[in-house]
Amino acid sequence: MANCIDLKISAALIERLNVARVLCFGDSNTWGTVPDQAGRYGINARWPALLNDALTDVDVIEEGQQGRTIIHNHSFEGHKSGQRYLKDCLERDSPDLVLILLGTNDLKERFSLSADAVAKGAAGLAEKTQQFKRASMNKSIKVLLIAPPAVYEVGCYAKMYAGAHAKSLQLAKYYALYAKNIGCAFFDAGSVVTPCPQEGIHWQIDQHQFLAAALVPIIRDMLGKSG
């Protein structure tokens, strides 16, 4: 009897190990920061969790960090570089597909980066992900490079993001260009998401729903899944 139970458990574990894994790698809008508050949306309200609910045959892994940038570190917030941390995530989680949604923090006035430079950095991160290999993985990782939506220079973030609005409106164009150059899938989050108009950076709860709904069919197509 014990052997039968053990076999059933082993079979279930093997089946689960064969499920496609999707890594959502982003910043505070992946982490779930609530606009104009110190709080965080509940785990079931954030867009990665909504993807996990909709994609029942996929394991969605949430990897968001407040203040995360593409390459540069904040002078007083420690190591927030996505480039520095992503490799550890790839080794730990062994994803089949990685969704990269970064670039908003790189628009901060202190970094003095153009929209072109931000997009080029994001594409560089995507390309390194495509090229990542480890012994236990016999195929390349697929990547969906997502351009963040526009930001607004309002409220408490106005000074920090001085000059960022105009740059943010150009991100999708450059992200699409560089994604095409490296043979990477692309999506413009700004086509479905708008940040809180009073706060300018973070998303209200319905925007998480809009993004998840838009990404579900794209993910299914990229993973070769139907229905």
Model-found features: residue ranges?
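Alpha-helical cap/lid subdomain in secreted, periplasmic
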Residues: 4-6, 10-17, 49, 79-227
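Structural motif
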Residues: 70-81
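Active-site beta-alpha loop architecture of Rossmann-like, nucleotide-cofactor-dependent enzymes
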Residues: 32, 69, 105
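Serine-esterase "nucleophile elbow" of acetyl-processing enzymes
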Residues: 2-65, 73-74, 88-90, 209-210
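Short secondary-structure boundary/hinge segments and terminal tails
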Residues: 69-71, 196-197
